[in-house]
Amino acid sequence: MKKPIVAVIAGGYSGEHSVSLKSAAGILSWLGSEPFSAFLVLIERDRWSVRVSEQREVPLDKNDFSFDLDDERIRFDYAYITIHGTPGENGLLQGYLDMIGIPYNTGDTLVESLTFNKYVCNRFLSGFGIRIADSMRLTGRDTQPDVADLTARMGLPLFVKPNVGGSSIATTKVVEAAQLLPAIGQAFSEGEEVMIERLICGTEVTCGAFLRKKEVVALPVTEVVAHNEFFDFDAKYNGAVEEITPARISDEATRLIQTMTARIYELLNARGIIRVDYIIEADGIPTLLEVNTTPGMTPTSFIPQQVRAAEMDMKEVLCTIIRDGLNETQ
């Protein structure tokens, strides 16, 4: 029986392109050569290709998600999406894969388009009793809002960030009114919508979850202590942060975070691995920051840390997700 052929899809069209490549390298190293044949698939605006060796890439046929190698036509059996941003995190790639009948590791088009829009996703989850921060959304018609009106409504300090996207790119902490319009302009440079959110004080934590045999497994909680003003791109990827797994919180708080994460997973009808970020405020209740459906997967990323803390094996977690996805289509 031939080994299933898995595409680890990376790249994409956003500012998180380089992060995606690092995540893909991590996934490929964990998967190894057994029990699947895994290839890196690179998606660029002008080219989709398959890396068949360190020095060689061949074109990917978008008609059926296949490629030619040594006079043999090879069609992928499964897609492991690790694109951070468009088109892998907003439902576009999922729709394409659905059309050609290739199973994949994330939620479907509806789930991904919902979770990619931070404002809409948080509002949706708040309807089920999940606490969220006070926030508002600006569209392209609101590039020059009334600063006095906005600060009177939201107060200061605030966070201003693109409403879609991740890695805290173009995110600004605004502590005085004069900083607001430049921050909004910077956020609009990364997308067509901007989210403005009230600053929340407390302990920042994050918790991953995945589905194993139709049961949601919530991983140990990580505490995030940023050495910068907040957990920005520099903190995430240049080491300006302390990540403590398991988090230095009570057992009760840990159980609450894990229960909330599992519930969010189920409410969203998620698949694969997700990560949910929170702030635990002074009253002990977690406030949702955002849901990430294609979290970073480098060896030092949160999810691998949490898997190790749970005394699980990263390869086995990935293989479980892929096997379950393949079995659903058989």
Swiss-Prot record:
One of its GO terms (biological process) is regulation of cell shape. InterPro entries: ATP-grasp, ATP_grasp_subdomain_1, D-Ala_lig_Van_CS, D_ala_D_ala, Dala_Dala_lig_C, Dala_Dala_lig_N, PreATP-grasp_dom_sf. Gene3D superfamilies: 3.40.50.20, ATP-grasp fold, A domain (3.30.1490.20), ATP-grasp fold, B domain (3.30.470.20). Mg(2+) 2 binds at residues 290, 292. Binds 2 magnesium or manganese ions per subunit. Signal peptide: none annotated. Mg(2+) 1 binds at residues 277, 290. Its cofactor is Mg(2+); Mn(2+). It is found in: Cytoplasm. Residues 122-323 form the ATP-grasp domain. It is an enzyme of class 6 (ligase). GO terms for cellular component: cytoplasm. It comes from the Bacteria. GO terms for molecular function: ATP binding; D-alanine-D-alanine ligase activity; metal ion binding. Pathway: Cell wall biogenesis; peptidoglycan biosynthesis. Its EC number is 6.3.2.4. Belongs to the D-alanine--D-alanine ligase family. PANTHER family: D-ALANINE--D-ALANINE LIGASE, D-ALANINE--D-ALANINE LIGASE B. HAMAP family: Dala_Dala_lig. Cell wall formation. This is D-alanine--D-alanine ligase. The gene is ddl.
